Swiss-Prot record:
Subunit structure: Homodimer. Interacts with msl-2; promoting recruitment of the male-specific lethal (MSL) histone acetyltransferase complex to chromatin. Interacts with Nelf-A. Interacts with NELF-B.
Effect of deleting the gene: Lethality; females die at the third instar larval stage, while almost all males die at earlier developmental stages.
Organism listed in the record: Drosophila melanogaster
Chain ranges of zinc fingers (C2H2-type): 127-149, 360-382, 388-410, 416-438, 444-466, 472-494, 500-522
Protein name per its UniProtKB record: Transcription factor Clamp
Length: 561
């Protein structure tokens, strides 16, 4: 049996037919077994689905090996050949979810084979820290939170896991995905939970299914231990204990989960190696394949070509026969090496989101876009690519429009004017943010404490109150801060710099908030004129104070300033 177990293939259980295990040998011979349960398998086999309708084979996942029991998730379509289990994508309506586990002896077990998918929206998508189990609405926020775990120890994390209790479940990660997607036109989505690792690329994700539990304010949402809440504490409530906030990041072996194939041609999928060399080659393939443009016309559906399904004007393409991973392609792609027929072969699929006007979703931060070209341009912000450089100061930008806006700093141009107060701004977003100071609008709301903010950047900084993240560290004393501005102000304590001066008494301060508090002293006494020194050395503020009899100038003397 060990010599034959190269792949384990699940056939689609359409019309109530039971799933069947298949062993694929090195020469391509497929041996079938009537049952899955109890079969011996390799340490890291690859699971497949084949559909009875067209014979297409799909690579769904490899088993993870994070604990004694290995687990993978299988999206089972009903009445069709489209299926996927990826970030933010709906499963086919009426689909069932099968969970296959492998015990320490390598025996396959099936549980919840026909568990129905809950009808939920994309709002159920969340990102879970694999160290402390905290939940976050965006992957970028999770990655920022996980920096706080880098100095911990694995033993401490194991203690917290023991306190948390509950059923442990292995994680299947998605490597090499450019844009996880499902081509189902209409469908319902389950509560899919994303688990990320710093060792993965931003586009790589882990997918697991888990029921979400309500957190209690008086207990740590991670380990369940009681927390002492300060009754007079202002701001958001603390949701995690100090021990969990200092837990370390643990290494977790990640396996592969790819977008399900969509096609009417049988195409066996090969096992993809997880060695560094193989993964580097896969990343090169992904980078090379995603540099094209959106196709504008359909290819012929003749011999040697994939069928084309035109959904709308905003499309992407996906090759079933290149590298066996189902990686999404953009633009035209030659398949002469596959079919022996030259030319372009395109298979179009559409990313579906909950917003019909913005069907393209960023799988890193959750941003929505109306065009794929906008999404592609947006992802440069995450990759760090900056091809547009200022010829004056040398700063580089990810988009041409960012460079254009930056150039106004040098030219002094401020074309955007507030209709209420007349203030002018160099960029349109700055004007919109300013206008909210007049309207009182606060459209950016924190999902934890429901506090609203006028600017998205302010909300982003506010979230660190809940995550406990303090990524900005003083190199002199080691103090850490949640915001760069706080570190900048703190650095003035060491340098002695006090750039903020009072225009009334010339007192200097390190930050503008201290200056603002100081000005309140002058406002309390009605002081508006610059100070002077009297003959006896006391500080004198000259001010015109109206009197009932006359309006002569009077001197207000304040000692000690």
């Amino acid at each position: 049996m060990e010599d034959l177990t190269k792949n384990i293939i699940f056939t689609n259980a359409i019309n109530g037919q039971p799933a069947t295990i298949q062993y694929q040998t090195a020469d391509g011979t497929i041996l079938k077994q009537p049952k899955i349960e109890g079969q011996k398998t390799e340490q890291q086999p690859t699971f497949y689905y084949t559909t009875n309708g067209n014979g297409g084979t799909v690579n769904l996942a490899q088993l993870a090996t994070t604990d004694d029991n290995k687990t993978c998730y299988i999206a089972q379509p009903v009445g069709g050949y489209n299926y996927a289990l990826v970030n933010g994508m709906p499963l086919n309506q009426g689909a069932a979810l099968g969970i296959a586990t492998v015990d320490a002896q390598g025996r396959i077990q099936i549980v919840n084979q026909n568990k129905p998918i809950a009808a939920n929206t994309i709002s159920n998508i969340s990102f879970k820290c694999d160290v402390c189990s905290d939940m976050f609405p965006h992957l970028a926020l999770l990655n920022a939170h996980k920096r706080m775990h880098t100095d911990g120890e694995q033993q401490q994390q194991q203690q917290h896991n023991a306190q948390a209790g509950g059923d442990s479940i292995a994680v299947v990660s998605a490597q090499g995905l450019v844009q996880a997607q499902n081509i189902i036109g209409n469908g319902q989505m389950g509560q899919i939970q994303i688990v990320s690792s710093d060792t993965l690329e931003p586009v790589q994700q882990s997918v697991m299914q888990q029921q979400q539990h309500e957190s209690k304010a008086s207990k740590c949402i991670n380990c369940g231990s009681s927390m002492l809440q300060q009754s007079k504490r202002k701001g958001p409530k603390q949701v995690r204990c100090e021990s969990c906030m200092q837990a370390e990041q643990t290494a977790q072996q990640q396996q592969q989960l790819f977008v399900a194939q969509d096609g009417q041609m049988a195409h066996p999928v090969q096992i993809i190696s997880t060695t560094p060399q193989a993964q580097a080659q896969l990343q090169q393939i992904v980078a090379a394949q995603t540099g094209g443009t959106t196709p504008k016309r359909e290819a012929s559906s003749g011999s040697g070509h994939h069928p084309v399904k035109k959904r709308n004007s905003q499309q992407m393409t996906k090759c079933q026969k290149c590298n066996g991973s189902g990686v999404v392609l953009v633009g035209q792609h030659s398949h002469a090496s596959h079919s022996g027929v030259g030319g372009s072969v395109k298979q179009s699929v559409t990313v579906k989101t909950e917003n019909p006007s913005k069907p393209f979703s960023c799988n890193i931060c959750g941003g929505l876009f109306s065009r794929y070209s906008s999404l592609w341009s947006h992802k440069k912000l995450h990759s760090g690519e900056k091809n547009y450089k200022c010829s004056i100061c040398g700063l580089a930008f990810a988009k041409a429009v960012y460079l254009k806006n930056h150039a106004r700093i040098h030219t002094g141009e401020k074309p955007y004017k507030c209709q209420t107060c007349g203030m002018q701004f160099s960029q349109s977003p700055h004007l919109k943010n300013h206008e909210r100071t007049h309207s009182g609008e606060r459209p950016y709301v924190c999902g934890v404490c429901d506090k609203g903010f006028a600017r998205h950047a302010t909300l982003w900084n506010h979230r660190r109150i809940h995550t406990g993240e303090k990524p900005y560290k003083c190199e002199i004393c080691g103090s850490a801060f949640s915001q760069a501005a706080h570190l900048k102000n703190h650095a003035k304590v060491h340098s002695g710099e006090k750039p903020y001066k009072c225009e009334i008494c010339s007192a200097a301060f390190a930050d503008r908030f201290a200056l603002k508090r100081h000005r309140g002293i002058h406002q309390k006494y009605g002081q508006t004129a610059p100070r002077q020194t009297s003959s006896d050395g006391m500080i004198v503020h000259k001010q015109e104070i109206p009197d009932m009899e006359d309006e002569a100038q009077q001197e207000v003397i304040i000692g000690g300033l």
